[in-house]
Amino acid sequence: MEPTKDETHAIVEFVDVLLRDGAVIQADVIVTVADIPLLGISLRAAIAGMTTMTAYGMFENWDATHRQRSMTGGRTIPVPNEKNGK
């Protein structure tokens, strides 16, 4: 029997799934000394590709602003005001 090498790499598959589907990580940590709570940490993170983030309504304004800047060479074009049209 000859040894074989698996052609798929687990880390590449993991990153593909993470960017495509995303992940939400939530953690609450309380640091105590002698049963006295000293520090509380609440963490919530969403990790995904920008396509997935904007599909779920996250970073929509940021994405639109940066796309506009890249299309205009770094210049920001003011959006007309609805009241006065300027």
From Swiss-Prot:
Induction: Transcribed from early-log phase, decreases as cells enter stationary phase, probably as a long gvpF-gvpM RNA. Highly expressed in 25% salt, poorly expressed in 15% salt, no gas vesicles are formed at 15% salt. One of its GO terms (cellular component) is gas vesicle. Pfam families: Gas_vesicle. Disruption phenotype: No longer makes gas vesicles in H.volcanii; cells translate GvpA but do not make gas vesicles. It is found in: Gas vesicle. Keywords: Gas vesicle. One of its GO terms (molecular function) is structural molecule activity. Its main location: other. The keyword Lipid biosynthesis does not apply. The keyword Electron transport does not apply. It comes from the Archaea. Signal peptide: none annotated. Encoded in a 14-gene locus called mc-vac. GvpF to GvpM interact with each other in vitro, and may form multi-subunit complex(es). Might interact with GvpA. NCBIfam families: halo_gas_GvpM. Proteins GvpF to GvpM might be involved in nucleating gas vesicle formation. A minor component of the gas vesicle. Gas vesicles are small, hollow, gas filled protein structures found in some microorganisms. They allow positioning of halobacteria at the optimal depth for growth in the poorly aerated, shallow brine pools of their habitat. Belongs to the gas vesicle GvpA family. This is Gas vesicle protein M. It comes from Haloferax mediterranei (strain ATCC 33500 / DSM 1411 / JCM 8866 / NBRC 14739 / NCIMB 2177 / R-4).
